[in-house]
Amino acid sequence: MQTKPFRIGTRGSPLAMAQTHETRDRLAAAHGLPPEMFEIVILSTKGDRITDRSLAEIGGKGLFTEELEQQLLSGDLDFAVHSSKDMPTKLPEGLFLSAFLPREDIRDAFVGRSAKRLVDLPQGATVGSSSLRRQALIRRLRPDIDVITYRGQVETRLRKLAEGQVDGTLLAYAGLRRLGMEHVPTELLDPEEFPPAPAQGAICVEARIGDDRINTLLAAIDDPRTHEAVSCERGFLATLDGSCRTPIAGYAQSDGTHIRFAGMILTPDGTTSHQIEIDGRAADAERLGQEAGERIRAKAGPGFFSSWS
């Protein structure tokens, strides 16, 4: 019988804390445990501390996970809670993504200062985003506006917008909903036209391979449909060596038996893009994503990535 609290690792941002509290509450309810049986351990990551440069410049997605993973591997944490889209496709040896919570809305949200929609921004307007995918998609749709790198927590980005530093910004709608800020967006973007990042809107829990006690605990909150969809999307990303240096979009939908995936790769300036759609058995989700990646890479040709990466 567990007598000491389970130690949950997380970043300290308001969004990370909201995701961790949701995970803790689901675990407590699933196992009939009081919330006090889960101790939340807040760690600062390099990605949190360096906010004046793009992720591509300072090392990519692993900057939000490295400190948490070190504590997991040392045994100081029992598991860690992350935004799935922040996770590198290659994890440290001995760790894996044990569980995925039911997925939130996958869409991107536009927040405009004056213009309510992305298409309504005047020529020469400025939009801030830290995501190469969002930057490329904006340039694809609106080559007449300026896109600047714009990092920070959700609240920081919205404050900069209110101060007039930019005319608009894009945020994951899932994050806004988790923060109780679903009223903030002025437009929700159609994923057919503005596809999300792979794994966007999904919370994942990272744990040690072979830690049966913890992984049995986490299995109670794992959502199979989300697990299948995100596995497919991460398979696509991994095949394309996806990181914060690559504009890659994609999302999968699973009904438990069948899964459909749509993906896109773009040049950073948004002038060239390639798309892929594929479907298959949900049981083959990761392999299906890998196949989609192989097909779109062949479609784009060998010079596509080397021409700008």
Curated annotation (Swiss-Prot):
Keyword Nucleotide-binding: no
PROSITE patterns hit by this protein: PORPHOBILINOGEN_DEAM (PS00533)
The UniProt record lists the keyword Transferase: yes
Known cofactor(s): dipyrromethane
Top-rank lineage group of the source organism: Bacteria
SUPFAM superfamilies: Periplasmic binding protein-like II, Porphobilinogen deaminase (hydroxymethylbilane synthase), C-terminal domain
InterPro entries referenced in this protein's UniProt entry, alphabetically: HemC (IPR000860), Porphobilin_deaminase_cofac_BS (IPR022419), Porphobilin_deaminase_N (IPR022417), Porphobilinogen_deaminase_C (IPR022418), Porphobilinogen_deaminase_C_sf (IPR036803)
Any single Gene Ontology cellular-component annotation: cytoplasm
Cofactor comment text: Binds 1 dipyrromethane group covalently.
Positions where S-(dipyrrolylmethanemethyl)cysteine occurs in the chain: 244
Pathway(s) of this molecule: Porphyrin-containing compound metabolism; protoporphyrin-IX biosynthesis; coproporphyrinogen-III from 5-aminolevulinate: step 2/4
EC number: 2.5.1.61
An annotated Gene Ontology molecular function: hydroxymethylbilane synthase activity
A biological process from GO: protoporphyrinogen IX biosynthetic process
Catalyzed chemical reaction(s): 4 porphobilinogen + H2O = hydroxymethylbilane + 4 NH4(+)
Entry keywords, A to Z: Porphyrin biosynthesis, Transferase
Note from the entry: The porphobilinogen subunits are added to the dipyrromethane group.
Subunit and interaction comment: Monomer.
Function statement: Tetrapolymerization of the monopyrrole PBG into the hydroxymethylbilane pre-uroporphyrinogen in several discrete steps.
Homology family: Belongs to the HMBS family.
Name listed for the protein in its UniProt record: Porphobilinogen deaminase
Organism: Rhizobium meliloti (strain 1021) (Ensifer meliloti)
Gene that this sequence comes from: hemC
